Structure formats: structure tokens, C-alpha cells
């Protein structure tokens, strides 16, 4: 499966780019570093998982991507609460993250059923 052609990788990459652009000049380096790392981890783990030779390995990395998505959502919610992220933008990002997690779960189930 070519990861560049999957909707999950495309959407995760777009979300990551949006977050990087939003936090480009942010002053709180610790928060900026954490949220951008979480965002980058999602498409990176999707890519790594889909390039693996076994379904078992692919599933492992797709689960890492789901974990990073949950981590990102947590940081988004906190960012909204502390005034670092506009509420409307943040809630859109959180929804996208939820949808990505659901897409990844579908892919994990598909790969798991191939065994």
C-alpha cells in the first residue's frame, strides 16, 4: 500500500502543516515543540507503518499514530484553555484528529482481518 495515496496520510499531513504554520512564531517553545511533534508523529507513523513488510508491524505503527492523535487532541484542548489556540480553529483540529483516529482504526481492523 502506497502511503502517499491514503486519505489518512494526506489528511494527517495537512493537519500537521496547519499546526506548524499556526505555531511558527509562537513564543512558548515548550508547548510549540510538544504540539508540533505530536502533529508530525501522526503522518510519520502512518508512512512508516504502511511501508513495513508485515501487517503486524503496520498495525503497530498505525496504533502509534492513533496514540499521537490522542496526544495531539489533548494538547489542542489545553491550548484552547490557556489561550494559545483560537477555539474555532482548535475544535476543527480536534475533530480532524478524531476522524483520523477513526480512519486509522478502520485500517487497523482491515489489516488485522487479512491474517
Specify the residue positions occupied by each region the protein language model found.
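Amphipathic alpha-helical assembly/interaction segments
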Residues: 1-115
Amino acid at each position: 500500500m502506497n502511503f502517499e495515496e491514503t486519505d489518512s496520510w494526506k489528511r494527517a499531513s495537512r493537519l500537521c502543516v496547519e499546526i506548524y504554520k499556526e505555531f511558527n512564531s509562537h513564543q512558548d517553545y515548550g508547548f510549540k515543540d510538544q504540539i508540533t511533534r505530536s502533529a508530525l508523529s501522526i503522518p510519520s507513523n502512518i508512512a512508516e507503518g504502511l511501508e513495513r513488510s508485515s501487517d503486524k508491524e503496520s498495525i503497530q505503527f498505525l496504533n502509534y499514530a492513533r496514540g499521537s492523535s490522542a496526544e495531539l487532541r489533548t494538547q489542542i484542548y489545553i491550548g484552547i484553555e490557556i489561550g494559545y489556540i483560537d477555539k474555532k480553529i482548535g475544535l476543527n483540529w480536534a475533530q480532524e484528529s478524531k476522524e483520523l483516529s477513526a480512519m486509522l482504526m478502520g485500517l487497523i481492523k482491515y489489516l488485522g482481518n487479512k491474517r
